[in-house]
Amino acid sequence: MEFQAVVMAVGGGSRMTDLTSSIPKPLLPAGNKPLIWYPLNLLERVGFEEVIVVTTRDVQKALCAEFKMKMKPDIVCIPDDADMGTADSLRYMYPKLKTDVLVLSCDLITDVALHEVVDLFRAYDASLAMLMRKGQDSLEPVPGQKGKKKAVEQRDFIGVDSTGKRLLFMANEADLDEELVIKGSILQKYPRIRFHTDLVDAHLYCLKKYVVDFLMENGSITSIRSELIPYLVRKQFSSASSQQGQEEKEEDLKKKELKSLDIYSFLKEANTLNLAPYDACWNACRGDRWEDLPRSQVRCYVHIMKEGLCSRVSTLGLYMEANRQVPKLLSALCPEEPLVHSSAQIVSKHLVGVDSLIGPETQIGEKSSIKRSVIGSSCLIKDRVTITNCLLMNSVTVEEGSNIQGSVICNNAVIEKGADIKDCLIGSGQRIEAKAKRVNEVIVGSDQLMEI
């Protein structure tokens, strides 16, 4: 077994709590399938027979009861009161990890050719290979913004070599001063570095087993994304001794990069002597000189996905965008499953767009129009209703003559007769009164708050 696959399904969705207060984030519907279905399906498509899923007991129950997979899931439940980062979760399951690992987030929806990332990892005998995508802003408004400016996300500064594969620099702008400081040892080998500020980490990582061994012994690292990967990138082109000397000068790194916990103490001699991977792909390795590869023991690579679907569902806006995109993806992944479920009852079928999904046991009345929308299971949509660019979860009722546009309607909500709703988020179990006009509002229970 070359890799062990690990799906991280622990995070509670802190930036979309109005959605996750009643449904655990891994089970949030996207295209009428739980979010966690997408990384599991990706692994199954490329031939994985086993997967480790790190999650909570609530998600475990759903996985055992509802999921039908060929893969054998090994479900690891973290303690209910634990506040674990991704690195903490890897440490928690460490006894199960015997080989290199492939780590995916439960909220990743992508049609990436997974071998593109894995081949990088194999070809360069990398310590880390990761997936990134070009950032893209949705042109659609986010429900409930009320005209406020979108919060500016902190950008990552990503430096790569001329091939765009070797990851040479990685830092968030919040951690940077007014200048970028690049190691002289990197500039000697790569005098030209391409910097990107428009790349987004997809949270898909191939990691060498010795990196996991290092992580097990270094409890100060809690996050793969924000701590472990920048550490590995910094460690490139450094020997253990030279790095030790540098640490003595850099007080702010001392606590995390103690000599006894240096990544180089976990490297196996075989990793530097085994040149077979380079023989297989030498023609593709123009960016790294042959004589440098063995000495550069820590090697980080990135596959930048420029086309296709690659989205992490971490905010309401990204959740909406994912639901707009998945009908096309599902048509390719599950051609045997119709976009309109066979048990759905639709009076005016010609008014349901081919870009919409309709879940099981849903009823749609006469002269009701559904365009660019995802409708969940057991919904009741009465006559003369117009729904455009929306997501309706399960068991939603929409009464006669209502018009809903650009909105998310959560489980068991009721939209009464003649209501007009635009760019809103309606929380679970909420009721909108008849003939109400709601624009750019977030209508949720008092225990549901969210960062958009």
Curated annotation (Swiss-Prot):
Pfam families: LbH_EIF2B (PF25084), NTP_transferase (PF00483). The keyword Protein biosynthesis applies. Disulfide bonds: none annotated. Acts as a component of the translation initiation factor 2B (eIF2B) complex, which catalyzes the exchange of GDP for GTP on the eukaryotic initiation factor 2 (eIF2) complex gamma subunit. Its guanine nucleotide exchange factor activity is repressed when bound to eIF2 complex phosphorylated on the alpha subunit, thereby limiting the amount of methionyl-initiator methionine tRNA available to the ribosome and consequently global translation is repressed. Keywords: Acetylation, Cytoplasm, Initiation factor, Phosphoprotein, Protein biosynthesis. The modification Phosphoserine is found at S260. PANTHER family: TRANSLATION INITIATION FACTOR EIF-2B SUBUNIT GAMMA (PTHR45989:SF1). It is found in: Cytoplasm, Cytosol. CDD domains: eIF-2B_gamma_N, LbH_eIF2B_gamma_C. Component of the translation initiation factor 2B (eIF2B) complex which is a heterodecamer of two sets of five different subunits: alpha, beta, gamma, delta and epsilon. Subunits alpha, beta and delta comprise a regulatory subcomplex and subunits epsilon and gamma comprise a catalytic subcomplex. Within the complex, the hexameric regulatory complex resides at the center, with the two heterodimeric catalytic subcomplexes bound on opposite sides. One of its GO terms (molecular function) is guanyl-nucleotide exchange factor activity. GO terms for biological process: cytoplasmic translational initiation; oligodendrocyte development; T cell receptor signaling pathway; translational initiation. The modification N-acetylmethionine is found at M1. Belongs to the eIF-2B gamma/epsilon subunits family. It comes from the Eukaryota. One of its GO terms (cellular component) is eukaryotic translation initiation factor 2B complex. Gene3D superfamilies: Hexapeptide repeat proteins (2.160.10.10), Spore Coat Polysaccharide Biosynthesis Protein SpsA, Chain A (3.90.550.10). Activated by the chemical integrated stress response (ISR) inhibitor ISRIB which stimulates guanine nucleotide exchange factor activity for both phosphorylated and unphosphorylated eIF2. This is Translation initiation factor eIF2B subunit gamma. Its main location: cytoplasm.
